[in-house]
């Protein structure tokens, strides 16, 4: 009896990992791009499946660990990744189909980036359905990045950036460089995007595109309507910077100001925003936003005497004017062109003026659209902490 128990336990232990897949046999999915099939791709529908309203063209970027090691060694021509593009009407069916298209078992726990094309994001219900799929899948992480592409997502995943082993790795790293540029939106995490969808708040998502030089470019943002959860327009880099200042999300960047026709580069080191609101009657809301910046003159000219306080004060005033121009411009666009509050002013009222907010929230973006009618007064105060490089200008 004892011998039988020992043999049974031994057999159990030795077969405990019968379904294990070796790491070198896995196909790690690190990037996903979602498009609408174009006319040429529609004609190549698989197995007689005609074009449907919800057809997707999905590109999966997979990395092979064994090739990743060899690709890093000198003289190796092995590519550490490969792309597979499939077409279907649901993401779940395409995930199942992916397993039959590669000899390696697809593994999604290391998925870093999901790129949704602007055409897909315009479809009614499409974007929310896609986000819901990724949230519900057990292998997906809520920290993965979500981006919208201006153009085909497939084309972006097919570009191999210089000095990087794979496109997704470059995209994942570059998307986090907000400390270098105020024109980039903060990384749009799946969890936060899904929360905005549930709350039916209008929101922004990082924008990615391809330049004329065929390089990957992360700049600007995609604007989504909170009621329909559909993409409704782009904000360029400067307007995105304006939203970052108002939302207190600027971590760095450069402001180019002019003094006497000469360009001065002001490197931002710290930004602090203060805000308060005043509600008159039941419907008139006024926001007072103070933006304080501190930074360095990174590029100046030798003939400009920066030891004089008057020169520094004039430069600070020019910087104030530039930031005020950027922020007021995006406020005008959001209020007059879109009528959508992606500045999170409604969220501020909900926290700081809850009773009044409950009375006006249904008319904030809809109905009377009180967001568009609210007053937003912005004041900027910039300080030059120290000077940087001096460049001697040409003398006549």
PLM feature segments, named:
Residues 2-396:
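Membrane-proximal alpha-helical signals and transmembrane carboxylates
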């Amino acid at each position: 009896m004892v011998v039988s128990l020992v043999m049974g336990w031994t057999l159990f232990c030795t077969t405990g990992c019968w379904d294990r897949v070796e790491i070198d046999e896995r196909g790690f999915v690190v990037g996903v791009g979602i498009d609408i099939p174009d006319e040429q791709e529609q004609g190549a529908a698989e197995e007689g499946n005609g074009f449907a309203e919800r057809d997707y063209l999905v590109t999966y970027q997979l990395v092979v660990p064994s090739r990743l090691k060899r690709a890093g060694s000198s003289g190796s021509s092995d590519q550490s990744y490969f792309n597979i593009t499939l077409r279907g009407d649901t993401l779940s069916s395409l995930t199942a189909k992916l397993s039959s298209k590669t000899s390696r078992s697809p593994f999604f726990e290391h998925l870093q980036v999901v790129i949704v094309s602007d055409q897909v994001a315009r479809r009614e219900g499409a974007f929310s359905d896609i986000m819901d799929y990724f949230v519900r899948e057990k292998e997906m992480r809520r920290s993965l990045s979500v981006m919208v592409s201006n153009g085909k997502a497939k084309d972006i995943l097919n570009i191999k950036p210089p000095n990087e082993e794979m496109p997704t790795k470059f995209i994942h790293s570059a998307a986090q460089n907000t400390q270098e540029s105020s024109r980039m939106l903060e990384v749009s995490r799946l969890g936060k995007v899904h929360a905005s969808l549930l709350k039916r708040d209008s929101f922004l998502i990082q924008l990615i595109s391809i330049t004329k030089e065929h390089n990957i470019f992360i700049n600007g943002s995609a604007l989504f309507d909170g009621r329909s959860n559909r993409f409704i327009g782009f904000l360029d880099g400067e307007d995105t910077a304006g939203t970052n200042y108002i939302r207190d999300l600027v971590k760095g960047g450069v402001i180019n100001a002019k003094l006497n026709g000469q360009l001065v580069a002001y490197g931002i080191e710290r930004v602090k925003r203060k805000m308060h609101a005043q509600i008159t009657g039941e419907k008139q809301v006024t926001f007072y936003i103070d933006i304080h910046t501190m930074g360095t003159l990174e590029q100046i000219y030798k003939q400009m005497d920066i030891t004089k306080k008057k020169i520094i004060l004039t430069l600070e005033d020019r910087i104030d004017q530039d930031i005020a121009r950027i922020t007021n411009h995006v406020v005008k666009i959001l209020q007059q062109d879109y009528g959508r509050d992606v500045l999170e002013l409604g969220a501020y009222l909900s926290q700081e003026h809850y009773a009044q907010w409950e009375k006006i929230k249904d008319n904030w973006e809809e109905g009377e659209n009180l967001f568009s009618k609210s007053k937003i007064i912005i004041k900027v105060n910039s300080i030059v902490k120290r000077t940087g490089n001096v460049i001697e200008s040409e003398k006549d």
